[in-house]
A protein has these predicted regions:
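N-terminal binding-site loop/beta-alpha segment at the start of enzyme catalytic domains
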Residues: 1-54, 239-242
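Short, flexible/disordered intra-domain loops and linkers
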Residues: 4-15, 68-74, 142-148, 203-206
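Alpha/beta enzyme core
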Residues: 17-30, 83-86, 103-136, 142, ...
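N-terminal active-site wall of soluble small-molecule enzyme domains
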Residues: 21, 41-47, 52, 60-70, ...
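Substrate-binding cleft of extracellular glycoside hydrolase catalytic domains
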Residues: 57-119
Length: 258
């Protein structure tokens, strides 16, 4: 049973080197295989220190909430330029060339193309971290499924797998719906790993606990369970046997476990 962990809550409070040490020691103690991190440029140096301590990190991309905040503060062009300036020099040259054929789509504010470029810039910044996996954000996955927009997801999968050579984790708040939709779209889901709430209480399991359990037991997809303790409402002794019985690949280390 693999243990994963989230860096997002931790890094909002990181201020001292001692805090970073305690984070890495906790992950090492529990043999965390993968630490998930929603890409934030200002946190990059802290994440680099965690990686240097031997913790494997997987970015969650694209960070739409951060992009929306930047757009609100200065418009989409300024938000994109700021991200472009932070790229490695080689990527600054290659990115415009790769997307030259998509200029018309960008001019028309094609949503899917914009998401792809945003994710590409974030992943390019994460390459120095030695990443081997990338998580496609639930904000994108669930929206694509809701709008029945296969092209958005296919484009992002190609970006992560072919352009960067990474394994894909699909984050979703609607496991039962998303898993069936991707199969309907003809996507080879056996190469993907799903990250979604799975717990004995059925908290966050959509469209229903039974539907999510069926996905886990199907053997057609790999699932890593999030929220197994329902934000601290369940003891790990009660939560762990339930997810193990479903045959999940692993689960996110609850914040309550020190």
């Amino acid at each position: 049973m693999e243990l994963w962990a989230s860096l997002d809550r931790v890094l909002t409070t990181v201020a001292e080197p001692g805090t970073l040490r305690s984070v890495t020691e906790r992950f090492q103690q529990h043999q965390v295989r993968l630490a998930l991190w929603t890409f934030v440029q200002e946190q990059f140096s802290a994440v680099q220190q965690i990686v240097n301590a031997g913790v494997q990190v997987a970015p969650i991309v694209p960070n739409l909430p951060a992009f929306v905040r930047d757009v609100t503060g200065g418009g989409p062009v300024k938000a994109m330029i700021g991200r472009f300036r932070a790229l490695p020099s080689g990527t600054k040259f290659a990115l415009p060339l790769r997307n030259a054929g998509n200029a018309l789509k960008l001019a028309k504010q094609d949503f899917g193309m914009g998401l792809s470029i945003l994710a590409e810039m974030e992943l390019a910044r994460c390459v120095p971290l030695g990443i081997r996996d990338a998580v496609i954000s639930s904000a994108v996955i669930d929206l694509a499924v809701a709008l029945n927009n296969r092209d958005v997801l296919v484009r992002l999968l190609a970006l992560v797998e072919r352009r960067f050579g990474l394994s894909v984790v699909v984050e979703t708040a609607n496991l039962g719906v998303s898993a069936s939709k991707l199969i309907e779209w003809g996507i080879d889901t056996q190469r993907l790993t799903y990250l979604s709430p799975i717990n004995r209480a059925g908290y966050g399991m959509r469209p229903s606990q039974a539907a999510c359990e069926l996905v886990c037991r199907s053997g057609r997809v790999r699932v890593v369970a999030a929220d197994i303790d329902c934000d601290g409402e369940l003891r790990l002794d009660d939560a762990d046997p339930y997810v193990r019985a479903l045959g999940v690949q692993g689960y996110l280390l609850p914040d309550s476990i020190r």
